[in-house]
Amino acid sequence: DFPLSKEYETCVRPRKCQPPLKCNKAQICVDPKKGW
């Protein structure tokens, strides 16, 4: 299994973001509270 990506790291499959980060259209993990 892959480690969860931190802020501004990739979330290209099969990588996933650490909560509460979300994957944006550029496939980067971002904090939704800060906007996209």
UniProtKB/Swiss-Prot annotation:
A single GO cellular-component term from the record reads:
extracellular region
Keywords carried by this UniProt record: Calcium channel impairing toxin, Disulfide bond, Ion channel impairing toxin, Ryanodine-sensitive calcium-release channel impairing toxin, Secreted, Toxin
What is the reported tissue distribution? Expressed by the venom gland.
Q: What is the effect of changing K16A?
A: No effect in insecticidal activity
Citing just one GO molecular function, the answer is:
toxin activity
Q: Which cysteines are joined by disulfide bonds?
A: C11-C23, C17-C29
Statement: the UniProt record of this protein carries the keyword Membrane: no
Where does this protein reside within or beyond the cell? Secreted
Stated role: Affects the activity of both ryanodine-sensitive calcium-release channels RyR1 and RyR2 with high potency. At lower concentrations the toxin increases full openings of the RyRs, and at higher concentrations it inhibits full openings and induce openings to subconductance levels and reduces the number of full conductance openings. The different actions may be attributed to the toxins binding at different sites on the RyRs, with binding at a high-affinity site mediating the increase in full openings and the induction of subconductance states evoked upon binding to a lower-affinity site.
Question: Which additional comment does the entry carry?
Answer: This toxin may reach its physiological target by traversing membranes, which may be by slow permeation. Alternatively, scorpion venoms are known to contain amphipathic helical peptides that form pores in the cell membrane, and it is possible that these pores would allow this toxin to enter the cell.
Q: What is this protein called?
A: Insecticidal toxin LaIT1
Which species?
A: Liocheles australasiae (Dwarf wood scorpion)
